[in-house]
Amino acid sequence: KDIIEEIVNLVHEAEERFDSEIYIVSDEPYRKIIFDDLEYPNVFELHNRYIVATSHSKDLALPGERIGYIAVHPNIDDKTELIDALIFCNRSLGFVNAPALMQHVVESLQSVTVDVGEYQKKRDFLYPKLIKMGYKVVKPNGAFYMFPRSPIKDDVKFTEELLNHKVLVVPGTGFGLPGYFRLSYCLEDSILEGSLSGFEAAISKYSDN
């Protein structure tokens, strides 16, 4: 919440400086996948001109499904104009819509989510193992990704080294984080356990660098 409040404060300062209304658009597909008893803040309490876009592909474990919604503050100005613009974008840009049945039931899905505890257990299994091997990584508070620092500057080269050990990760360069790599731990426990030897072998090769 502190980070979001900092962003909102910056927006409020900019609105005063430029005498203009500024909208915050937040993409929040992981808002329900939070660990350690943390809670996601109600962003609409912080800023009237807040637009939230979210997808149930993550919190319902339906990868690839186009099921979600866009929510705006109830006191936002020009709601009709905004809705018209969203409908226009959806029609003209060729997005794939959710099946009609899912569009009707999506409202009833708001209190439903995957077992977040399962993701947290996987995080709690993998994180200390990577730290012990020598990887530098921030412990995530949600979702199901980690961004360890590559032990060498060339993150692409290191991901190729991991691939040689049958561990598939993605270079951080593709996410604007050169020098890091992204791994996903929403996998079977046996796969996570099987990856440990590969992570160990890869970092051992560059441990003196």
Give names to the regions the model predicted.
Residues 1-209:
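PLP-dependent class I/II
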